[in-house]
C-alpha cells in the first residue's frame, strides 16, 4: 500500500526533533545530497528580496546588546551572569567591553525579558 503525501507529512510532523534530525541524516545518505546546501540555495533568493527578507529574518531571532553598563556596574554584572551562566570574570569582561552582545538568536520574548532584566540592573540594553 502506497502512502499519500498527507500521511507522510503527518508522520513527519509527529516526530521529535531528534528523530527528525536522524531522518534528515538518513535521507542525505540514501540520496547522496546535503540538506545544508539546499537550505543555502533556498535562503539566498529570500535574502536578495530586500528589506522584506531582512525583516522576516529579524522577526524570529533577536540579539540582546548591552549598550552600556550604567552607574550600577555590580548589579549589571550579576544580571549578565544570570542571563548567560558566565563566571564572574567573564561576565565582568563582557560588561567592560560594552557595547557587546549578551544573547544572540533568541526569541522576541526571551530578548525582551533579558533586556528588561539588564535595564532593571541599571544598564542600557538594545534588542536587534
From Swiss-Prot:
**What are the BP-aspect GO terms?**
translation
- Tell me which CDD domains the record gives: Ribosomal_L7_L12 (cd00387)
Disulfide linkages recorded for this protein, renumbered to the chain, are none
Recorded GO cellular component terms are: cytosolic large ribosomal subunit
Single annotated GO MF: mRNA binding
Q: Which UniProt keywords apply?
A: Ribonucleoprotein, Ribosomal protein
> What Pfam families does this protein's entry cite?
Ribosomal_L12, Ribosomal_L12_N
**Xref: PANTHER family:** 39S RIBOSOMAL PROTEIN L12, LARGE RIBOSOMAL SUBUNIT PROTEIN BL12M
| Matching HAMAP family | Ribosomal_bL12
> According to its UniProt record, which protein family does this protein belong to?
Belongs to the bacterial ribosomal protein bL12 family.
Known role: Forms part of the ribosomal stalk which helps the ribosome interact with GTP-bound translation factors. Is thus essential for accurate translation.
This protein's assembly is summarised as: Homodimer. Part of the ribosomal stalk of the 50S ribosomal subunit. Forms a multimeric L10(L12)X complex, where L10 forms an elongated spine to which 2 to 4 L12 dimers bind in a sequential fashion. Binds GTP-bound translation factors.
Entry protein name: Large ribosomal subunit protein bL12
Q: Point out the gene that encodes the protein.
A: rplL
Amino acid at each position: 500500500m502506497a502512502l499519500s503525501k498527507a500521511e507522510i507529512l503527518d508522520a513527519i510532523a509527529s516526530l521529535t526533533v531528534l528523530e527528525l534530525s536522524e531522518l534528515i541524516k538518513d535521507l542525505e545518505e540514501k540520496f547522496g545530497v546535503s540538506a545544508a546546501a539546499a537550505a543555502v540555495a533556498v535562503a539566498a533568493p529570500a535574502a536578495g528580496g530586500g528589506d522584506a527578507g531582512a525583516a522576516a529574518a529579524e522577526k524570529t531571532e533577536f540579539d540582546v546588546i548591552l549598550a552600556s553598563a550604567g552607574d550600577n556596574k555590580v548589579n549589571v554584572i550579576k544580571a549578565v551572569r544570570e542571563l548567560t551562566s558566565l563566571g564572574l570574570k567573564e561576565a565582568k569582561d563582557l560588561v567592560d567591553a560594552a557595547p557587546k552582545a549578551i544573547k544572540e538568536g533568541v526569541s522576541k520574548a526571551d530578548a525582551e525579558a533579558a533586556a528588561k532584566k539588564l535595564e532593571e540592573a541599571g544598564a542600557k540594553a538594545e534588542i536587534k
